[in-house]
């Protein structure tokens, strides 16, 4: 097994020799040369958030809450296009905002989670689409509540270092405290919720902090077995953000992080967002990714609106050029489709 020390040494090295050695190891563990993706619809239920991250443009003071009719319209269109995943997302703890609460009450809901539950339930009852929710920090009871209407859920760890809470990236973001995020990911494991997490590359973290974060994810997965995929997401400069002058991670920096993550995490799928890496995506295929994540024929990436999705044919072409077969998957990985990992009512739709 790759040790923490060896992994940090690899990231610090500027020699090509270790890269070639790692590539040989990756080729020896390649998962049948398959690369997966999920055909999805991105539904930003509300774009207010208690966190003000130095790299994000999703949050808006002049927020919008999507109406149920707006959500239904997207879901029905997505269903007609053959999508199988609905990514429901909103900012963290939106109920802290009194104006958000007032609007939800006018819509007939006590809080945002009650509204989300209703949307997910409608999705399951009226379409072939399966809900996946990523909405920031949730406690044990909230996760348990949403498990009934979600096949999987997600939360980026981002980084396990508390030091970043004092930097421009997270100094105004109480929900980015890694203790809170680790607690939620562990609670999802206790509840047997198939889970997506990941780390951000290029937000001011050190090589050691990157590796520690990957090993923290490994620790949680070894304890609960619930992490189905890990996203290695590169920071991208956006106009007007506090981190506008930060340097984006280089392709080789990302390539090495993908390789080392795959060798550390072994059976967990590794994903790099294809819309953030259109020119370098093939490099990451060589480096060990086995999933492209959600790709939508209908909706944009509301977190990275400047980066359009590649179409499925484009992904297929550059997968095939390296001998990979592109395969569609559900928002829940096949090994989790059983009564231990999914609500019995949802399971009936899948078997």
From Swiss-Prot:
Keywords: 4Fe-4S, Iron, Iron-sulfur, Lyase, Metal-binding, S-adenosyl-L-methionine
Single GO term (MF): transferase activity, transferring alkyl or aryl (other than methyl) groups
Entry coiled-coil feature ranges: none
Chain ranges of the Radical SAM core domain: 35-275
EC number(s) recorded for this UniProt protein: 4.3.1.32
Pathways involved: Cofactor biosynthesis; coenzyme F0 biosynthesis
Binding positions for [4Fe-4S] cluster per the UniProt entry: 49, 53, 56
Cofactor: [4Fe-4S] cluster
Catalytic activity: 5-amino-5-(4-hydroxybenzyl)-6-(D-ribitylimino)-5,6-dihydrouracil + S-adenosyl-L-methionine = 7,8-didemethyl-8-hydroxy-5-deazariboflavin + 5'-deoxyadenosine + L-methionine + NH4(+) + H(+)
Bound cofactor: record note: Binds 1 [4Fe-4S] cluster. The cluster is coordinated with 3 cysteines and an exchangeable S-adenosyl-L-methionine.
Family per record: Belongs to the radical SAM superfamily. CofG family.
Subunit structure: Consists of two subunits, CofG and CofH.
Cited function: Catalyzes the radical-mediated synthesis of 7,8-didemethyl-8-hydroxy-5-deazariboflavin from 5-amino-5-(4-hydroxybenzyl)-6-(D-ribitylimino)-5,6-dihydrouracil.
HAMAP family cross-referenced by the UniProt entry: FO_synth_sub1
Protein name listed in UniProt: 7,8-didemethyl-8-hydroxy-5-deazariboflavin synthase
Lineage of the species this protein comes from: Archaea, Methanobacteriati, Methanobacteriota, Methanomada group, Methanococci
């Amino acid at each position: 097994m790759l040790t923490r020390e060896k992994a940090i040494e690899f990231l610090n090295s500027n020699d090509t020799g270790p890269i070639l050695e790692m590539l040989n190891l990756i080729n020896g563990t390649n998962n049948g040369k398959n690369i997966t993706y999920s055909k999805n619809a991105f539904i930003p239920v509300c774009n207010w958030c208690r966190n003000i991250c130095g790299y994000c443009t999703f949050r808006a003071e002049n927020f919008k809450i999507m109406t149920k009719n707006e959500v239904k319209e997207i879901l029905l269109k997505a269903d007609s296009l053959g999508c199988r995943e609905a990514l429901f997302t909103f900012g963290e703890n939106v109920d802290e905002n009194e104006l958000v609460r007032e609007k939800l009450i006018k819509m007939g809901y006590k809080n945002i989670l009650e509204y989300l539950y209703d949307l997910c339930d409608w999705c399951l009852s009226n379409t072939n689409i399966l809900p996946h929710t990523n909405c920031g920090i949730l406690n044990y009871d909230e996760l348990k509540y949403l498990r009934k209407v979600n096949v999987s859920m997600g939360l980026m760890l981002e980084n396990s270092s508390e030091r970043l809470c004092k930097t421009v990236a997270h100094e105004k973001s109480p929900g980015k405290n890694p203790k809170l995020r680790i607690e939620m990911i562990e609670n999802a494991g206790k509840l047997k919720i198939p889970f997506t997490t990941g780390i951000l590359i290029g937000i001011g973290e050190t090589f050691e902090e990157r590796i520690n974060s990957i090993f923290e994810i490994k620790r949680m997965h070894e304890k609960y077995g619930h992490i189905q995929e890990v996203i290695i997401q590169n920071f991208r400069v956006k106009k007007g953000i506090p981190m506008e002058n930060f340097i984006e991670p280089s392709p080789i920096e990302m390539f090495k992080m993908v390789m080392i993550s795959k060798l550390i995490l072994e059976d967990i799928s590794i994903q790099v967002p294809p819309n953030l890496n259109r020119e370098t995506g093939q490099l990451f295929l060589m480096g060990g990714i086995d999933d492209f994540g959600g790709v939508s024929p209908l909706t944009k990436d509301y977190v990275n609106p400047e980066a359009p999705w590649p179409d499925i044919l484009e992904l297929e072409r550059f997968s095939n050029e390296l001998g990979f077969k592109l395969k569609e998957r559900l928002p829940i990985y096949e090994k989790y489709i059983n009564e231990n990992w999914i609500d019995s009512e949802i399971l009936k739709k899948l078997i």
